[in-house]
Amino acid sequence: MLQIILRRLMKALLWFAAGSALVVLVLRWVPPPGTALMVERKVESWFDGEPIDLQRDWEPWDKISNNLKIAVIAGEDQKFAEHWGFDVDAIQAAILHNEQGGSIRGASTLSQQVSKNLFLWSGRSYLRKGLEAWFTMLIELLWSKERILEVYLNSVEWDEGIFGAQAAAQHHFRTNASALSEQQASYLAAVLPNPRQWSASHPSGYVSRRAGWIRQQMRQLGGDEYLQGLNSSRRW
């Protein structure tokens, strides 16, 4: 009996691995029609008795401002071009910080955030973390860095029901994602740790200071030259 159970479990795991790899491979070229986070937000709104309309318009890489691309990297994951999905130094620093009793600090890379937003539910369980690591490895193996950032910018939440760069640009600044200035981009990047509590268009003092720091980091990264190097980091 035990052997039968183990064989069935192994078969199920193999089917899951093959199926998830196929989905990630398809999404290398096909825009994701939605995300797990969008479904979660919609269900939450139904249970709260206040259904919301989700706003999201997919924009290809060349229709998104370089300012926003650099701002998000500067604010969220400055080792994005170097790592293969996991920032070991940031993980170690977060563990040490959390053990010392500070507020819980995350260390998720952009690749990990894409995995979580696209495929998984919110929470901190070991199962979810394990699945996040699996999807992160698949994404890093099968997508270019450019594609990872493109999907991130079209999937990330920027306010209640606002998903992706185009919806965020229109909602906060009444402009298009392609026209975002350095300052506007820095404010959008500054609210990403908590986009439903912080506002890019009506920033608090903390958000304004964080946006100023992000602009400094954008210039140190090298701006458009950094993106040119990122574009050349294709896998195959």
Curated annotation (Swiss-Prot):
Gene3D superfamilies: Biosynthetic peptidoglycan transglycosylase-like (1.10.3810.10)
Ranges in coiled-coil conformation: none
Signal peptide, first to last residue: none
GO terms for biological process, alphabetical: cell wall organization; peptidoglycan biosynthetic process; regulation of cell shape
Catalytically driven reaction(s): [GlcNAc-(1->4)-Mur2Ac(oyl-L-Ala-gamma-D-Glu-L-Lys-D-Ala-D-Ala)](n)-di-trans,octa-cis-undecaprenyl diphosphate + beta-D-GlcNAc-(1->4)-Mur2Ac(oyl-L-Ala-gamma-D-Glu-L-Lys-D-Ala-D-Ala)-di-trans,octa-cis-undecaprenyl diphosphate = [GlcNAc-(1->4)-Mur2Ac(oyl-L-Ala-gamma-D-Glu-L-Lys-D-Ala-D-Ala)](n+1)-di-trans,octa-cis-undecaprenyl diphosphate + di-trans,octa-cis-undecaprenyl diphosphate + H(+)
Pathway where this protein functions: Cell wall biogenesis; peptidoglycan biosynthesis
Purpose of the protein: Peptidoglycan polymerase that catalyzes glycan chain elongation from lipid-linked precursors.
Protein name: Biosynthetic peptidoglycan transglycosylase
Subcellular location as annotated: Cell inner membrane
Similarity field: Belongs to the glycosyltransferase 51 family.
EC number annotated for this UniProt entry: 2.4.99.28
HAMAP family linked: PGT_MtgA (MF_00766)
Transmembrane segments: 12-31
Protein origin, superkingdom: Bacteria
Record keywords, A-Z: Cell inner membrane, Cell membrane, Cell shape, Cell wall biogenesis/degradation, Glycosyltransferase, Membrane, Peptidoglycan synthesis, Transferase, Transmembrane, Transmembrane helix
GO MF, any single term: pentosyltransferase activity
Gene: mtgA
InterPro entries assigned: Glyco_trans_51 (IPR001264), Lysozyme-like_dom_sf (IPR023346), PBP_transglycosylase (IPR036950), Pep_trsgly (IPR011812)
